[in-house]
Every structure is written in structure tokens, then in C-alpha cells.
Amino acid sequence: MIRIKICGITNLADAKAAIDAGANSLGFNFYEKSLRRVVTADAAQIRSKLPKEVEAVGVFVNARPADINSLRAFVRFDAAQLHGDETPDIASRVASSLPVIKAFRVDASFALTTLNRYADVFAFLLDGARAGQYGGTGQTADWELARCAATSHRIILSGGLKVENVAEAIRVVRPYGVDVASGLETKPGKKDHGRLKEFIDEVRRAEQQLGLQLDHSKENPIQP
């Protein structure tokens, strides 16, 4: 089953809507410059009300490992998504205490061999590339490149996904998971609950149509 991560969660209503629709992973953005940044206390409150089987992912951009660990102690997220320019050493230091999803902003010029340098990372999130921005741009990632990466790595496809294109993205890439934020919003940080359900329904429909028999139940970052 393809994992579905709804990112940019800032309030309990959106978190509940995502879970009710079938999402199994929620992203909480702690990057101070993000339009979807969540207040730490709000993230902790939302996390406390999530079912145990729903994964909470803390999203960071160039944060210090010590700061990530301190925030984790308060919010109790299950995995860290590193969405900046973090080195393999930084990723390994974070991965020593919790599972890491390393994000890359990719276009046709991205070298897939870069992924091999991050040996301790649980999964890679491939996002659309736009100069000077760390995600949430709505820019589509290079699906062909992502497809190649997915043959040898756990790939979470992100960047420009929405109801209208997620089925085709899954057909092309066959990813471990999909990630969406801006594609389901009425405004930054507020989800359209109707579109959210449509998106998740499209993912599950695509799985059935393609006959995907992927079982990632043993590959949840909560229990790597």
C-alpha cells in the first residue's frame, strides 16, 4: 500500500480530516520561513490526539540535530524530514535517534548518485525544484528521474501533486509514498477537506487499477 503523507498540518480539524480520509502520515513544518509553519504547542496538542498507527513527521530545513531532538522530546514526532541542504553527516547524526526522510528538490539535472551518499536515511522525498525555495512551491518533480530512483530506493514523490495528476504520477513512478501540501489547500496551512478525500481516493484507485501489491507495513519509519 502506498503511504500517503499530508504535509503542512497546522490544526486539528485538518489532521482529523486527513486521517478519516485514509492518510497514514502527517507532516508538521517547523521551518520558520514557511507559510505552513506550525506553532510548536499546537503540533504537540495535535500529535497527542493522533492514533498510534498514524505517523507524525517533523519537517525541518537546515536545523541542528540537537534542536531537532529537543523539539521531538516535546512534540513526539516519529520521523524527521530534512528538507534543506543537510549533508550526509548531518542526516546520519539525526538518524542515530530517529528515522530520517531526506528531501531533495530535483529536476532533470539532479544526479541520482547523490542518494547513495545518504546511507542512513530511511527514505527519500523528491520534490519539485524552484530556485531559493525549500518546498511547498507546487512545482512538479521530474517523474522519470523519480521512477529511476524508485527502482533502488524508497521514494516519496512530492511536488505539484493534486487530485488531477496523482494517479498518473503513481503509474509512472511506482513510489513508496506520495506527499502533498499546497495541492489540497484553500490557503497556506488550511486544507480543503473535500479535495483531500478525493486525493486519497485517487491514490487508492490507482493502486487497484495498476494492480500494485506493495506491502510497506513493515517499512513504516515508526518501526524501521
Locations of the language-model features?
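Conserved N-terminal beta1-alpha1 strand-loop-helix module at the mouth
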Residues: 1-224
